[in-house]
Amino acid sequence: MDAFDVIKAPVVTEKTVRMIEEENKLVFYVDRRATKQDIKRAMKELFDVEVEKVNTLITPKGEKKAYVKLKEGYDASKIAASLGIY
């Protein structure tokens, strides 16, 4: 899968903004067929960051969300600012 096909859009809520600031995590809507490895690869390709871990869930609406924790030394708030979340 292409990186642009994997990651669809950032999730922007009060909870996700808190996660960016306190836990160094970003939350995205992703393609339902994307695996955790696909999501890691897409994050590295699109944002040039190293990913520590990826947690995924499928919402009752059928959308897949990915909670992406970045490794030490990478700042989620900088990526969030470039995406227009702040």
Swiss-Prot record:
Keywords carried by this UniProt record: Ribonucleoprotein, Ribosomal protein, RNA-binding, rRNA-binding
TM ranges: none
Gene Ontology molecular function: rRNA binding; structural constituent of ribosome
Database matches in PROSITE patterns: RIBOSOMAL_L23
This protein's GO CC annotations: cytosolic large ribosomal subunit
Origin: domain of life: Archaea
Signal peptide: none
Any GO BP: translation
Family the entry assigns: Belongs to the universal ribosomal protein uL23 family.
Alphabetical list of NCBIfam families matching this protein: PRK14548.1, uL23_arch
Protein task: Binds to 23S rRNA. One of the proteins that surrounds the polypeptide exit tunnel on the outside of the ribosome.
Summary of subunit composition and partner proteins: Part of the 50S ribosomal subunit. Contacts protein L29.
Name assigned to this protein: Large ribosomal subunit protein uL23
Taxonomic source organism: Methanocaldococcus jannaschii (strain ATCC 43067 / DSM 2661 / JAL-1 / JCM 10045 / NBRC 100440) (Methanococcus jannaschii)
